[in-house]
Amino acid sequence: MNRLDIEKKLNEDRAWLLNTYAALTDDQLRADLTPSEHNPQNFWSALDHLAHLALIERNFAAMIRKHIAGDANPVGLRVDDNGVARSTEQIMASVHAMTEEWQITHHGKSLSEVVALGASARAVTLQLLSDLSDVQLEEVLPGAPWADGTVGGVLAANADHGRMHWKWVKDARLQRH
């Protein structure tokens, strides 16, 4: 994916996501919707789903920076730092624990505060995009299961991630009525 397409996708989908969330009432933003994958007793709200996107966007940028710096295992999901393979169950347990910690930390924030989290993460992504060469955007990010696995594809996947979480929010809201 080329630089222009990545930036357009990120900006257009971010604007769509902000408009979509802005159309919700405060009650709709804060209502318990989906059970946590880590602790099913804990429920995520629409705002929790929106805040989660900032965590993953920052993590993607950190993985890409590690790759550019020469780290052989920049994603660090499939194998640990010692090169030992992780099972899918181990990977998902680790990911769910990390996202749960983030959700608990940011639960209860206002829409404005959550939008600021996302803006900060997006700024990191756009700065990284501006720092990377066209050749680097086409490099494979070792261990990345997202998009086409390239650096550019992973950056652009942030847009798809937002739409995926919105679908979960929308579906959960429909089930409640």
What does each model-identified segment do?
Residues 1-20:
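Extreme N-terminal tail/first-helix region
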Residues 5, 9, 52, 117, ...:
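Short, contiguous, pocket-lining structural segments
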Residues 9, 104-120:
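A short, structured beta-strand-centered segment in the mid-to-C-terminal lobe
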Residues 12, 16, 117-120, 124:
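Charged, amphipathic alpha-helical oligomerization/scaffolding segments
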Residues 12, 16, 28-38:
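Charge-rich, low-complexity N-terminal segments
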Residues 24-29, 110, 133:
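Residues that cap or delimit alpha-helices
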Residues 32-93, 123-177:
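Short, contiguous alpha-helical
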Residues 37-38, 98-106:
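A short small-residue
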